[in-house]
Amino acid sequence: MSIKVTQEKLPASRVGLQIEVSGEQSRQVYERTLTRLSREVRFPGFRPGKVPRPVLIQRLGETALKANAIEDLVQQSLESAIAQESIPAIGNYQLSSDFETLVAAFQPGKSFSFEASVDVQPTATLAQYTGLTVEVAEVPFDANRVDNVLAEQQKQMATLVPVEGRNAAIGDVAVIDFQGILVESGEEIPGGSGTDFQIEVEEDRFIPGFISGIVGMAIEETRTVDATFPETYAQEEVAGKAAQFTITLKELKTRDLPELDDAFAQEASQYETIEELKTALTERFQAEHESEVKASKRDAILTALADQLDVEIPESLLQREISAMINETASRLSGQGMDVRKLFTEEVLERLRENSKDEDEQRLRRTIALGELAKVTETQVDDEAVKARAAELLSNYPRPQEVDRDRLITVVREELLEDKLLEWFEANNSVTFVAPKAAETEVDAASATVETTATETAEEAPEAPKAKKGKKKA
């Protein structure tokens, strides 16, 4: 379809199109629309596709026929305009002209004009990509982590021994009956009561005031404990409210910890000696720390690149990114056994989109900035390196025949390209590690926002007492 197209650059990476279609083309589309409708509509007394044109016009009406023809004409004209002008369009078009006005003015056989707009791939530029100074937040290595993990494993493998001659203290295991009410209304707290619950007497285990009320109790003692739900508590009906719990201490136990010896290592893990277990844990935590350091450096570099980026991100591209993040979160939650169909209501989805918009836009800026750096530095990845890395990953899959090979190649290529670009950036800019600022806890904000919003209503109050866990292999 040969058409006349006038383009206009609009804000937010949109292009305005003024399209003029010849009279002959408008007539042809109108005729094809009539033919299509004559096959699709069903009128009593007429076989499909055999409805006479006068009957079709009379039954459907001239306005409805014109509206159908214009819908076809606009769609076909836009597709032709985008192809003819080589417009890098993304997303759906938006009709700028008033549709009713177009219907009223449309006459088959006469030229037809309309206006529309469409999002296009954004044009991006990096103001600077060399000579930058980037500070990376140091990731402290917890030298006590191995000892802490072993101590926790000791607790899980400990034998519970009845306590005699003293009252409850932090670190004990208690068996209690409890019942909670809201102070203001006197109503019972939903899920706020239990019988023969075994709980760990640990600080910050429950809502403020609950555990401290148990400390000092004697066996068979009943005590009234005041507690307050945090303002940010997941259950809105009790958040920020004062509560009162009646608690009876029925049993009190302490842990008889096993020795950290070879027998412990053999029971807690696949290792024969305690030294082998400590070495394995040390190596694992060091590898995790190296990954965290790499992630911290990546985050700082991508943030610096995004700050140098001049781009207008189209709305359709942003919405696509938001949808991808929601789908990824839904898949992860589903893998954890959650019913995402119940979790992701229309209200929740609307909140997800709104809450994650800023973070998703920032992630898009980083992706675009990295792509622009690849262009200006002419950085590419060798095909053989991609194939070798993909083969290495496939060898670790239990069922490699189920892997989407094309998708794997794409992901590997992107990862290797990113690694090369980050190396190039570090070689051509100043990247230094500095002590993290106070209260600086950088996370994947988009994912955290989405997952928190999706799951915050799944929690119950007060927190259910924890049953003793089974033995864990280190």
From Swiss-Prot:
Main location: cytoplasm
One GO cellular component term: cytoplasm
A single BP term in Gene Ontology: chaperone-mediated protein folding
Domain PPIase FKBP-type: 171-258
Cell location: Cytoplasm
SUPFAM superfamilies documented for this protein: FKBP-like, Triger factor/SurA peptide-binding domain-like, Trigger factor ribosome-binding domain
Domain of life: Bacteria
Residue segments, region Disordered: 441-474
UniProt function note: Involved in protein export. Acts as a chaperone by maintaining the newly synthesized protein in an open conformation. Functions as a peptidyl-prolyl cis-trans isomerase.
NCBIfam families for the chain: tig
Protein name: Trigger factor
Gene name tied to this protein: tig
